[in-house]
Amino acid sequence: MSLRFVIGRAGSGKSTLCLREVQEELKQRPRGKTILYLVPEQMTFQTQQALIGSEDVRGSIRAQVFSFSRLAWKVLQEVGGASRLHIDEAGVHMLLRKIVESRKDGLSVFQKAAEQNGFFEHLGSMIAEFKRYNVTPSNVYEMWQQLDAHSSSAEQKLLANKVYDLQLLYDDFERALIGKYLDSEDYLQLLVEKLPQSEYVNGAEIYIDGFHSFSPQELEIVRQLMICGARVTITLTIDEKTLAQPVNELDLFYETTLTYEKIKQVAREEKIEIEKTIPLMEQPRFHSPALAHLEAHYEARPNEKFNGEASVTISTAANLRAEVEGVAREIRKLVADEKYRYRDIAVLLRNGESYYDVMRTLFTDYNIPHFIDEKRPMSHHPLVECIRSALEIISGNWRYDAVFRCVKTELLYPLDVRKETMREEMDEFENYCLAYGVQGKRWTSEDPWMYRRYRSLDDTNGMITDSEREMEEKINRLRDVVRTPVIRMQKRLKRAGTVMQMCEAVYLFLEELDVPKKLEELRIRAEESGDFLFATDHEQVWEEVMSLLDTFVEMLGEEKMSLSMFTDVMSTGLEALQFANIPPSLDQVLIANIDHSRLSDVKATFIIGVNEGVIPAAPMDEGMLSDEEREVLGAAGIELAPTTRQTLLEEQFVMYQMVTRASEKLYISCPLADEEGKTLLASSFIKKIKRMFPNVKDSFITNDVNDLSRSEQISYVATPEVTLSYVMQQLQTWKRYGFEGNLDFWWDVYNFYVTSDEWKQKSSRVLSSLFYRNRAKKLSTAVSRDLYGDIIKGSVSRMELFNRCAYAHFAQHGLSLRERDIFKLDAPDIGELFHAALKKIADKLLRENRTWADLSIKECEHLSVLVIEEIAPLLQRQILLSSNRHFYLKQKLQQIIFRTSIILREHAKSSGFVPVDLEVPFGMGGTGSLPPMEFSLPNGVKMEVVGRIDRVDKAEDENGTFLRIIDYKSSSKVLDLTEVYYGLALQMLTYLDVVTSNAQTWMKKGHAASPAGVLYFHIHNPIVEMKGDASEAEIEKEILKKFKMKGLVLGDADVVRLMDNKLSTGSSDIISAGLKKDGSFSARSSIASEQEFNVLQKYVHHTFENIGKDITEGVIDIAPYKMGNKAACTFCNFKSVCQFDESLEDNQFRSLKDMKDSEAMEKIREEVGGE
């Protein structure tokens, strides 16, 4: 029994010495005593390759490469102890979830924390840390007693409570494992116990290589190996000079020196012979003097400069993507020009979550074989999502999001259907569910679902059309596809008495869906597309899910569990599943995390993402215990993993290891912006390297090749996939600024694409975008007729939409595009309800020959309740009856109608105008409809403007009959004559024109009527602020003012007094007009003369004719208006269709000048030739 250390700085040949000794021993005595070669988990594969890579050693039974965990398996298989079931990380998380749920009421700190994402991962890590550092539940309990007895501050009490919770959960976890299960940490403890019984290890030659430190648990394994083995050789990265000095925590080799001392102490305790240490002083790894200098002087203060030609490259990149592309180009150059193999190259980084997706895409585009050494979660795989969402459907009462997450995994689809067709049908089905608000018991009810197109509150026709019947049949067929398998599982889960039966229900759910066959189809498809890594995912995920179910049954199979807890525990297990990373080939670039990688035999290393806060790492308080809490526990005798401070001290050694991996070339880079454009700073580490290599020039990596020299630009010509974007960039530049002769090689690249049989068609679409202009081509007369018909029949809103943006009009009325219906109450629905409610009250008054003025306050309240109760079942598929929230909203809407009724009552009392009719149709056909506004366009097409007028009021005096239009609005609105001039606000004046033009035939007395005005009535329930103790009358008066109707009224004092008979002088509380003492109108009055009303009506006719002409001539310009802070695009539903982009030359807003009403009126006069 002896111990030997092999020490040396990075690259001194420690591993090489050990491997050569083993290879020589195998060559001399191939059947001798066991040789164990122990390395960290991530080094096993490459060490095994290196061991048998010699020409003299092609294989070996005698020598084996192990990690500690694999050695535990080997020993336990030999001497026994492996019969207990192994539970992996997913099983641990599931067991902890069950323990926490059952203990929840007794927990002090973790009761609410258990619901946070990542809690069980942190808890599992904490328990694993306890075990690695030989801390038992009883140790934690004793610590709690000690803390509890001396807790005075809030921080101390929090720590005591936290330790108490940890002790409870740790103890429960250990009790659950005893005699039944083993987790990863238990194997190492068992290895310590079983090593003395192992014939395989007894007398073995043991090498321990690649470690920098050992946990207390691992140190116990090393102790037993020294006792059992013939000789233990341990390599450590230490400079021999360090051992001759006192241990200093600021020393580069502080961590490994501590490890050296700890192992020597163990050897002395066990009376193990300590052989003479072998110090290695040379630097055989480094073929580059610069890299040898970097290793030898890395920790020197001040920095030792290297003035020769350095094989170190430092780069900054415009952004993260540019950085990765720069790395990809350099890798291709190394392979093509310097005959590197891909396996000679490694990319090291720390913030992989920012880089991996980009690297996966770009390295594939550059045809660089690569392997990303990362643990990928299975949580996004369709199978995992299918199980999780199906359980959420059942436990969450069939909520929409859970149902369609399950549907979109496509595992519910029948095996024999065409997926493309099924996807389209499911999209329609989802639209139905969204429109009808389908959830809860509607899924489980046997009643068939109904399909009716929602038209309006007036549509009470119960007839179903053939197309509606066909759609209804399809919806019910798809409903059964979704619900049948889930309901079967739901029934089984509810019948289940034990966890085993619940797991069986999940398994049967998957079997009945033919999931194995569907996954096999996905695997074959992935292989056919050349995606072999993802092809293996589909095999792995089925095996892992089956293993998870087995583990669940083994651990908790006979227990009873509620459905909600089963769902939570299963979800926790599924979240912990990860794909095993198996390198698909030997010759590939390795992409690895700086902290976990153990590279060897690499010629070139790229260290990317070297930004401040990343390398070196910024301190982060993660996990269950803070740094301060760890220090308290450490002071009390419980040693745990290093604190942030200790980790920061070790960071220098991590970076030293990082820069000393390569033998020939080192590349260091950082981006100046992330993927979202956020600014990033270069790390101070780059400054350190620059000081060591003053001759190294900092290069800049960009994706814009225009500022680069010819030789630099040539390097951007890589694979056809990648180069095409740079050709486009050059062509765009030439198009804008002209041709530069010294870059004519880009024409050669362009010619490759347009002449290549393989790329001609692929590139033509991309290259055509060079001449892309986002313009909508004018429709031909024939197409326009097909879309709009020979007679254009449209509402005023449609005409206004055309003037806002002709393309939006085309999308809505030509292509009939619309957003999908959602089961929610929008402003138009509320507006429709208000209109219908007020009409019903007004109709009732007309039938009873009463007016609003005749109503009492109590009647107003009664009628508002009555009409809302009548309308609610008809509105938006009974949305107001669908939930408590909507029921509350119904009450609020009823209160608004009540308040509005009171105001209408007050208005009626003060007005000589009375309602003639409400919801007056024109151009709609049928009894009671006024004729449309008709136009014969120059091109022979007829156009009819149709609509429905909210309310028409009439007043009569000695001067004649006057009509006014009242339009109910759920938001405040004014009549802006500038908007009238631009054709954006035509509705009110059109309505006024229709009623005055048809007054003689429409009204019973049969004589003409004059325009009295157009007014907006804002339906709302305002809140008013009053100073002091205001009386109820004062409050009501203030509320009345909030309902002042805005618009445009006839500039006739008598007519205005008919609208507000309380007005003598001053401003009216009812309309936007006021009178001075001399009888003239105040400056703030919104008035127009009868002649001006006539001009406005002529202008409206003129505008409609222009709109009709443009529509029929196929005008569909993408030219939205913009006026001040108003723009057509603000609430437009078709932005994704027109793709309006101000950065394009062709896409600019139609800027409209805002004007005063007087200026707008003058321009309107000029247009129609009015006086």
UniProtKB/Swiss-Prot annotation:
GO MF, one annotated term: ATP binding
Cofactor: Mg(2+); [4Fe-4S] cluster
More info: Despite having conserved helicase domains, this subunit does not have helicase activity.
Positions annotated to bind [4Fe-4S] cluster: C805, C1129, C1132, C1138
PANTHER family: RECBCD ENZYME SUBUNIT RECC
Protein species of origin: Bacillus cereus (strain B4264)
Protein name: ATP-dependent helicase/deoxyribonuclease subunit B
Residues that coordinate or bind ATP: G8, R9, A10, G11, S12, G13, K14, S15
